[in-house]
Structure formats: structure tokens, C-alpha cells
């Protein structure tokens, strides 16, 4: 009895295995994202990193090599300042738009910014108000460590990171 495996069958098995591995990596990434914020990447107003939190602003497995996220700056940020996020599309058609979301203390999600440009090309710099990170827009509600998420418009998580509002 001959054992015969065709090249298309072997390639199909390899693609299926790679797909499962990537899906597992994305699922693990998203599980990390939904844990409570702990620590943050400290940055200057010029986006220089002072201390790096290895968990902050990683690019998800689905977007690695396609999107680069510059950590939020300045971080920490005062309630009377604004802070920036930079999202760089490394290739044309990497993503078709995105949204920036914060999880409020009552677990509601609040959209801070939406970008509908399709496709996103180059670097997009977003200016955000830390008062929007609180439940009622007050300085008291905004203070503390807040987690921000970045999703594409298809609902796939691109990145997440923590902001300290002082």
C-alpha cells in the first residue's frame, strides 16, 4: 500500500497550523489587553521614552509588521494638558480606518477618536484630552491609570496601552 501526500495537501495542513497559531496568539494578546491596567510607559512631551512598560503599546499579532504604535506622550499627563498617540501604517492598505477607545470605571466603552480614512497611509498623529478618560469629564474622574485600546473598523484589536492622568 502506497502512502501518498500531495504538495497541496501538505501546504494546506501547514497553512491551517499557521492560522491556528496566529489565532491563538491574537486571543492571548486580547486576554492580556483586558486585564486591569498596571504600569505605564513613561514618556516626555517630545515622545522620548523614559521608562518602558513591556506590556504597553505592543502591536497585536494580526497587525505585526503592518502597523507601528508610538507610545502615548506625554505620559503621565496632567488633566489640563493634552496627549498624543501616533499610529504608523507601514504599508498601503494595512488597515481601513481605526478607533481609539477607553474603558471607563463602570466598564462602559467610550470612543475617543475614529479615523475613517481608507486606506490609512503614513503616520497619523491623534491629539486626545485626558478629561475624556473619566466617566463624567471631570478632572477627579479622569485621574489615575487608564487603559486605551486601538481597534480597526472591523473590530480587530491593534494595540492597547496605559495612560497615567495626574
Residue ranges and their predicted role:
Residues 106-115, 157:
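Surface-exposed loop/edge segments in extracytoplasmic proteins
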Residues 20-64:
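Short, compositionally biased serine/threonine- and acidic-rich segments at solvent-exposed termini, linkers
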Residues 118-153:
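Short, surface-exposed loop/turn motifs with a glycine/proline- and acidic-biased composition
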Residues 55-86:
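Surface-exposed, proline-anchored Ser/Thr-rich loop/turn motifs
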Residues 88-93:
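Short solvent-exposed strand-capping/beta-turn motif centered on an Asx-Ser/Thr pair
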Residues 1-22:
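Sec-dependent bacterial lipoprotein signal peptides
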Residues 94-110, 150:
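Extended low-complexity, serine/threonine- and proline-enriched intrinsically disordered segments
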Residues 25-37, 145-166:
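C-terminal tail/sorting-segment detector
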Amino acid at each position: 500500500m502506497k502512502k501518498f501526500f500531495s504538495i497541496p495537501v501538505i501546504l494546506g495542513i501547514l497553512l491551517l497550523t499557521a492560522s491556528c497559531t496566529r489565532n491563538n496568539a491574537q486571543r492571548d494578546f486580547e486576554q492580556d489587553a483586558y486585564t486591569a491596567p498596571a504600569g505605564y510607559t513613561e514618556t516626555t512631551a517630545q515622545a522620548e521614552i523614559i521608562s518602558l512598560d513591556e506590556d504597553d503599546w505592543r502591536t497585536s499579532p494580526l497587525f505585526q509588521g503592518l502597523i507601528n504604535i508610538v507610545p502615548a506622550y506625554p505620559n503621565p499627563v496632567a488633566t489640563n494638558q493634552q496627549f498624543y498617540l501616533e499610529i504608523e501604517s507601514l504599508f498601503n492598505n494595512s488597515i481601513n480606518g481605526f478607533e481609539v477607545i477607553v474603558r471607563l470605571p463602570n466598564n462602559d466603552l467610550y470612543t475617543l477618536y475614529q479615523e475613517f480614512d481608507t486606506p490609512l497611509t503614513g503616520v497619523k498623529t491623534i491629539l486626545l484630552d485626558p478629561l475624556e478618560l473619566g466617566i463624567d469629564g471631570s478632572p477627579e474622574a479622569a485621574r489615575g491609570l487608564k487603559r486605551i485600546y486601538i481597534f480597526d473598523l472591523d473590530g480587530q484589536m491593534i494595540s492597547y496601552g496605559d495612560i497615567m492622568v495626574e
